[in-house]
Amino acid sequence: MFPKTIVRNTLLSNAEQYSISYEVRSVYNTVWRIDINDSITIPYRIGEKGIYPDYSNFDIDDKLAYLCYLTRNQSGFVRYNAIDELLTLVHKQIWVYPYILKLCDEYVIRILDRIYDSLPQIINEQFVDVICLNMNNIKKGYARMISYWNVYYRKDIPNIENYVGYKIYKLLIDASQTVHKS
């Protein structure tokens, strides 16, 4: 399924530098590249509990950063609500893409369904650049997705090609291969 990794040697046209920081606590955190010289570290999970602030009045960058942060919450409900809103704003900043890609290896099928339904609208040249720059993370996510399917969904969905997680990774890989052919 995975092609040889060939990273496009172009800078992403609209990439802006942002400093997003939080305390790193896990060896499971992943580093995602957003262009040739820039990367972000995404925590595996955050354990924040309690009341979340009303972010409706945040400016767009603060709102995006907060929603990205919530996609790492230990609660699947919080992650789903964050990705649901994030997917409507995704075109605002390139650094949002890795957070979406990280959620593609989830076991919560509602999250996967929501991402899959949105992918045709959000796959663009910048999104594909981020996929290509992070093919090792994509491969790890694919393996993780297979593992979750095997444990949680194989009985109900015996053909992995019918599993939404597989469909997501197929779209991602196909998109990355299309770029290299053009």
Pin down the residues of each PLM region.
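Conserved hydrophobic register position within alpha-solenoid helical repeats
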Residues: 82-85, 111-119
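Residue-level signature of the C-terminal ends
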Residues: 88-89, 118, 122-126
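Amphipathic alpha-helical scaffolding segments comprising HEAT/armadillo-like alpha-solenoid repeats
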Residues: 2, 60-68, 93-102, 128-132
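Long, helix-rich interaction regions
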Residues: 123-182
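Short coil turns that connect the paired helices of HEAT/ARM alpha-solenoid repeats
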Residues: 71-74, 104-110
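Alpha-solenoid HEAT/ARM repeat scaffold
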Residues: 65, 80-81, 98, 113
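Long, acidic/serine-threonine-rich intrinsically disordered regions with weak helical/coil propensity
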Residues: 1-52, 178-182
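Amphipathic alpha-helical repeat scaffolds
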Residues: 67-72, 83-87, 101-102
